């Protein structure tokens, strides 16, 4: 994957191109932003104007946000000596006299709150498979970018200062960017090696110090406890047979993965610690919707606040 030196050089190139959230959103305009929310790149492409090797901001937006094949001369002008390491790491793919992105680098940010400063950085994740109506299938180890679920968790998470935080299932790394604003120490885990590779780029580009570890659930932190645990697990309940996408559904039957996240997580909390999780759980005929969760959580001795939505 990308070395520390190459990541630092990439960040310098992103800064030089003004490839930041506010600048790019301003460049795309309202029509471009709304189009991308619908997975349509046409309004954004119009806003960026004609391709030019003298416009590194537009070049990077075309390469990573619109997922275009971009002329090699323009990519080289925007990224300079970083092109070689990106190709060697498999993050940039030659395509005749152009380059395509095999992983996306997007600017990210969040406004300051009463308890945390503003966040500014970049997120690295896999390309969107359905941009502009394309029907491409994601790779089994696909690393999802910013989603409504990850945004919801970031918005709901308690932001009081803590000494230690666990990002369980780091994915692209967005929760760790938020944790860095109020946690002295961050440990982040994932069973998907590609997720750790891309999250490492996310955290290093964004100046976040996180201890990234490979492993399933709480295995990588067996001897540790935390003040805060956040988790957006692969909670989709799917039929027992069929292919799985690592980011979406686990290998355990039904809602067993969610049960383990909650029950085992209770034992990983320090006194007065908090765990915040997005999840699905099975609702069984004849059983109140909350009884299944209560049966899991009562033996832990923890208080639980459950918000249910359709």
Regions found by a protein language model. Name each.
Residues 75, 153, 232, 261:
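Residue-level signal for inorganic ion chemistry
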Residues 95-165, 170-182:
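SAM-dependent Rossmann-like transferase core, predominantly class I methyltransferases
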Residues 139, 147-231, 237, 282-284:
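Conserved SAM/SAH cofactor-binding pocket of Class I
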Residues 192, 254-307:
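Conserved Class I SAM-dependent methyltransferase catalytic core
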Residues 193-194, 231-260:
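Mobile active-site "lid"/loop adjacent to the S-adenosyl-L-methionine
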Residues 200-201, 241-243, 289-291:
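Short amphipathic alpha-helical segments
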